[in-house]
């Protein structure tokens, strides 16, 4: 079952990306390194509620 999630920057807390994940294979919170246009650098983005 795929669910839609939002990824937020860990530096500035801006919600920059929307994506989906498979809850069965990834039950814990997802963290990806993505570009933040507010910080103007690549930072870790963590799944939010």
From Swiss-Prot:
A Pfam family this chain is assigned to: Ribosomal_L33
Biological process (GO), any one: translation
Entries under PROSITE patterns matching the protein: RIBOSOMAL_L33
Keyword terms, alphabetized: Ribonucleoprotein, Ribosomal protein
UniProt-listed InterPro entries: Ribosomal_bL33 (IPR001705), Ribosomal_bL33_CS (IPR018264), Ribosomal_bL33_sf (IPR038584), Ribosomal_zn-bd (IPR011332)
SUPFAM superfamilies: Zn-binding ribosomal proteins
Any one cellular-component term (Gene Ontology): cytoplasm
GO MF annotations, alphabetized: structural constituent of ribosome
Family: Belongs to the bacterial ribosomal protein bL33 family.
NCBIfam families according to UniProt: PRK00504.1 (NF001764), PRK00595.1 (NF001860), rpmG_bact (TIGR01023)
Protein name listed in UniProt: Large ribosomal subunit protein bL33
């Amino acid at each position: 079952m795929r669910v839609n999630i939002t990824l937020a920057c860990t530096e500035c807390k801006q919600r920059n990306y929307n994506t989906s994940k498979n809850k069965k294979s990834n039950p814990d919170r997802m963290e990806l390194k993505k570009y933040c246009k507010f910080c103007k650098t690549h930072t870790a983005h963590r799944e939010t509620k």
